[in-house]
């Protein structure tokens, strides 16, 4: 069994993801099992720039950024499962399916994200994902990654 009950802090996440502020949307990895699932958190702060315009009187964490948070969590799971962090071999986020937004996230919320590998073959990975705030599901989605060899 490949269960790792260890978190990944932001310094370890920096070594895996190329994203940086304001587009790094994973604050901590709570747990994962290689080739199975990963649990992470995104802390919503009023100081983040998108809250100024989405919406100034009623700030709401943008739904597309919930999807991006899921994609970043899935990217971390791909790396932690395969060990691949190679400029010649990349996994591209290529699709979103069956997405539903159930509730909103607002400043001060902590979004718990769980990504689970639903299907995997040589070049395609499909993830089933949920995002939760205060024990309420705020979003469900499936996302697709494709492996591309650059050389």
Swiss-Prot record:
PANTHER family attached to this UniProt entry: 3-HYDROXYACYL-[ACYL-CARRIER-PROTEIN] DEHYDRATASE
Active site (catalytic residues): 54
Gene Ontology MF annotations: (3R)-hydroxyacyl-[acyl-carrier-protein] dehydratase activity
Documented EC number(s): 4.2.1.59
Protein name as it appears in the record: 3-hydroxyacyl-[acyl-carrier-protein] dehydratase FabZ
Catalytically driven reaction(s): a (3R)-hydroxyacyl-[ACP] = a (2E)-enoyl-[ACP] + H2O
Residue pairs linked by disulfide bridges in the UniProt entry: none
Organism: Buchnera aphidicola subsp. Acyrthosiphon pisum (strain Tuc7)
């Amino acid at each position: 069994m490949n269960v790792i009950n260890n978190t990944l802090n932001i310094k370890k996440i920096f070594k895996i993801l190329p994203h940086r502020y304001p587009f790094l949307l994973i604050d901590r990895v709570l747990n994962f099992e290689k080739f199975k699932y990963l649990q992470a958190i995104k802390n919503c702060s009023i100081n983040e720039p998108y809250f100024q315009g989405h919406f100034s009187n009623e700030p709401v964490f943008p739904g597309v950024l919930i999807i991006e948070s899921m994609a970043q969590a899935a990217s971390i799971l791909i790396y932690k499962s395969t060990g691949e962090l190679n400029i010649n071999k990349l996994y591209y986020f290529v699709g979103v399916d069956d997405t539903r937004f159930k509730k909103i996230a607002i400043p001060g919320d902590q979004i718990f994200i769980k990504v689970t590998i639903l299907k995997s073959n040589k070049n395609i990975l499909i993830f089933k994902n949920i995002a939760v705030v205060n024990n309420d599901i705020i979003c469900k989605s499936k996302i697709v990654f494709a492996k591309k060899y650059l050389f």
